[in-house]
């Protein structure tokens, strides 16, 4: 069995959109500084790198699944040209209600990836920028790390208990 690092997309790989907004065009998709180098380090350390992302913009009709897949293909291509390999991307296109098994904090995307790609979740990591990301990792049996913006307040940092904190990300 292999090990993986599961990465959330918005706020970890690319700049997070303002609250209540969605990235539906490539022109609005901005990869964060240092992401390609970080993914390349994970690749060299022997981890599969898998993106797991909630994308309810599809359920809201703001973007088709085909367009979302094209955006993810482009993200993968841009990162690959910078020496960073994304092995797979899983997304949840559903609305928050009714509940599904793939929308984080549910572990469905991680469990599916593990089953399809032979991943040992106990030796894998979930890295995200939200409580839902960390919960998904915990629910799947992964180790977890939480990325926080450089401008996070001390109270925001204090309430993060389940994950290792990775500070210094300008998201």
Predicted regions and their residues:
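Asp-based, Mg2+/Mn2+-dependent phosphohydrolase catalytic module
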Residues: 3, 66, 70-87, 95-126, ...
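Active-site flanking residues adjacent to catalytic metal/cofactor-binding acidic residues
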Residues: 7-9, 53, 128-129
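A short secondary-structure junction motif
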Residues: 55-68
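Conserved protein kinase catalytic core
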Residues: 14-16, 60, 135, 155
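Pocket-edge positions in alpha/beta enzyme catalytic cores
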Residues: 23, 27, 60-63, 97-102
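Short Lys/Arg-rich amphipathic alpha-helical segments
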Residues: 36, 42, 47-52, 68-82, ...
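Active-site neighborhood of HAD-like aspartate-dependent phosphohydrolases
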Residues: 1-48
């Amino acid at each position: 069995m292999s090990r993986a690092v599961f990465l959330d997309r918005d706020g970890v790989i690319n700049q997070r959109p303002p609250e209540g907004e969605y990235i539906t065009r490539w022109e609005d998709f901005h990869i964060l500084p240092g992401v390609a180098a970080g993914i390349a380090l994970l690749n060299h350390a022997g981890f599969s790198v898998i993106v797991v992302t909630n994308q309810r913009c599809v359920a809201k009709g703001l973007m088709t699944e085909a367009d979302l897949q094209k955006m993810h293909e482009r993200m993968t291509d841009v990162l690959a040209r910078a020496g960073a390999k994304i092995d797979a991307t899983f997304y949840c296109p559903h609305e928050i209600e009714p509940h599904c098994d793939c929308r984080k904090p549910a572990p469905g995307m991680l469990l599916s990836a593990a089953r399809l790609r032979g991943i040992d979740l106990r030796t894998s990591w979930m890295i995200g920028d939200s409580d839902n990301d960390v919960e998904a990792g915990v629910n799947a049996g992964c180790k977890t790390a939480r990325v926080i913006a450089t401008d996070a307040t001390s109270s925001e940092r204090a309430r993060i208990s389940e994950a290792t904190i990775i500070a210094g990300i300008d998201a």
